[in-house]
């Protein structure tokens, strides 16, 4: 299966550069993978589209202000983008500087703390802090929100709120689980009143989510690692939804990948650890009955995931429809609600 099979043409004008004034005001393309059909709707229609007894599974990761402007001891500028924290004082960062960083070098951070380069792997460096210093306060005080590269503007103060879900609780992500950005308290309340239940998983989205697929044969793509947790509470909520005949609706590809990782043995079980799960056409889904997601980049692993879920022909045709109808694409863009093709559950 080739990378070029997942290409589509997208005018730059359709890439959303800022959020809508209201979170739930986005459009929503409802895609039926079994029938191969779609219809235009709005995110605010969700309470009427979902059924009492359905279960929404949301990712409660919290995006860190993960981009830091730092300096070498010589005064040279270093831009750091957190990939993942290993513990309170240790983490991997993507580093950009005029000259390569080397193990043993000191990096001067906003606020005066000094980190040490411990390891280097390509453009990634592992940085450690002294025993009395932690990364989270440094990032919160001196970092900026890590907007994706296709948003061609500097992060603003408002992005600290809008590039974050209203239910974000567990710090650790460097990119938002963007399907969740559409939910405001009014929409969540309306869904609860409808009888739609909700539960949470955690998947800390890493910087690797923006890495392109470089191999022409997509099965050779090395998937990046991300830390995640599916709790016993969530496993019980999924079992209860099944027992009452409800559907399990993953809010975002991150929630979907977390659920499917925890069900790799065929049964959903509590799971804490790393995932490198890559879902592409031919793979099956053990848990996910429906998927709410944004529109994804051409030839990306996330587009491959939704093609696996709803079928390539249906999904790529739905994308062409969305382009023709002027939908807004990517992180701050519109949404899709997808049901699976036959045999994918």
Curated annotation (Swiss-Prot):
The keyword Glycosyltransferase does not apply. Pathway: tRNA modification; tRNA-queuosine biosynthesis. GO terms for biological process: queuosine biosynthetic process; tRNA wobble guanine modification. InterPro entries: QueA, QueA_dom1, QueA_dom2, QueA_sf. Keywords: Cytoplasm, Queuosine biosynthesis, S-adenosyl-L-methionine, Transferase. One of its GO terms (molecular function) is S-adenosylmethionine:tRNA ribosyltransferase-isomerase activity. Pfam families: Queuosine_synth. Signal peptide: none annotated. One of its GO terms (cellular component) is cytoplasm. Monomer. This is S-adenosylmethionine:tRNA ribosyltransferase-isomerase. It comes from Acidithiobacillus ferrooxidans (strain ATCC 53993 / BNL-5-31). The gene is queA.
């Amino acid at each position: 299966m080739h990378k070029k099979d997942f290409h589509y043409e997208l005018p730059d004008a359709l890439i959303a550069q800022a959020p809508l004034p209201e979170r739930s005001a986005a459009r929503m393309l409802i895609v039926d993978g079994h029938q191969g059909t779609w219809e235009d709707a709005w995110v605010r229609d969700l309470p009427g589209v979902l059924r009492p007894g359905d279960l929404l599974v949301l990712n409660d990761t919290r995006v860190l202000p993960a981009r830091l402007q730092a300096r070498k001891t010589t005064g040279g500028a270093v831009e750091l983008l957190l990939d993942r924290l290993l513990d309170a004082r240790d983490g991997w960062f993507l580093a950009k500087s005029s000259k390569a960083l080397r193990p043993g070098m000191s990096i001067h951070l906003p606020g005066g703390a000094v980190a040490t380069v411990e390891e280097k792997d390509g453009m990634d460096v592992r940085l450690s802090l002294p025993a009395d210093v932690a990364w989270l306060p440094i990032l919160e005080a001196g970092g900026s929100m890590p907007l994706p590269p296709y948003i061609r503007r500097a992060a603003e103060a408002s992005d600290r709120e809008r590039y974050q879900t209203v239910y974000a609780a567990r710090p650790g992500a460097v990119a938002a689980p963007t399907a969740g950005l559409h939910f405001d308290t009014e929409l969540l309340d309306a869904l609860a009143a409808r009888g739609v239940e909700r539960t949470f998983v955690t998947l800390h989205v890493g910087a690797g989510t923006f890495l392109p697929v470089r191999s022409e044969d997509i099965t050779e793509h090395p998937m990046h690692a991300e830390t995640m947790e599916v709790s016993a509470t969530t496993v019980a909520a999924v079992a209860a939804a099944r027992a009452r005949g409800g559907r399990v609706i993953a809010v975002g590809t991150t929630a979907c990948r977390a659920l499917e990782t925890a069900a790799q043995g065929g049964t959903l079980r509590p799971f804490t650890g790393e995932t490198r799960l890559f879902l592409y056409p031919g793979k099956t889904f053990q848990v996910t009955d429906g998927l709410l997601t944004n529109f994804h980049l051409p030839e990306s692993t996330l587009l491959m995931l939704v093609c696996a879920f709803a079928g390539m022909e249906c999904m790529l045709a739905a994308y062409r429809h969305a382009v023709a109808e002027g939908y807004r694409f990517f992180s701050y863009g519109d949404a899709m609600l997808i049901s699976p093709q036959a045999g994918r559950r």
